[in-house]
């Protein structure tokens, strides 16, 4: 998805894209690490989850700089793994499908860049 120049955005909708993408990444990653915890997450449901995650990331990309800004604001307010994942995905020059990510590298980046918790 390419940003649409000079097209007004709806900030609340873009915020929802950021929140849902962060949440869906967290669900996806947790499932891959602990598949036994949710036996109902079969291949079809996992595929739907991936489609939704990609759609929310696309919604942020279409919003261009506003999408990046809003995702950054969500991360500033909630510095969690999902929010950092979204910010990082939006930094790429071209969209990278989540399926093509090296999950070990992605997890390592997140672990190394999340702020320390008290």
Model feature map: region roles:
Residues 1-117:
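N-terminal alpha-helical scaffold/docking segments in eukaryotic complex subunits
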């Amino acid at each position: 998805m390419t940003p649409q120049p000079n097209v007004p955005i709806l900030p609340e909708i873009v915020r929802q894209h950021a929140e849902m993408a962060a949440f869906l990444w967290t669900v996806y990653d947790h499932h891959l690490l602990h598949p036994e915890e949710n036996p109902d997450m079969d291949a079809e449901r996992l595929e739907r989850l991936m489609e939704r995650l990609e759609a929310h990331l696309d919604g942020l990309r279409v919003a261009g700089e506003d999408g990046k800004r809003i995702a950054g604001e969500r991360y500033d307010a909630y510095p969690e793994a999902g929010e950092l994942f979204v910010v990082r995905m939006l930094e790429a020059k071209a969209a990278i499908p989540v399926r093509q990510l090296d999950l070990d590298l992605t997890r390592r980046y997140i672990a190394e860049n999340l702020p320390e918790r008290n």
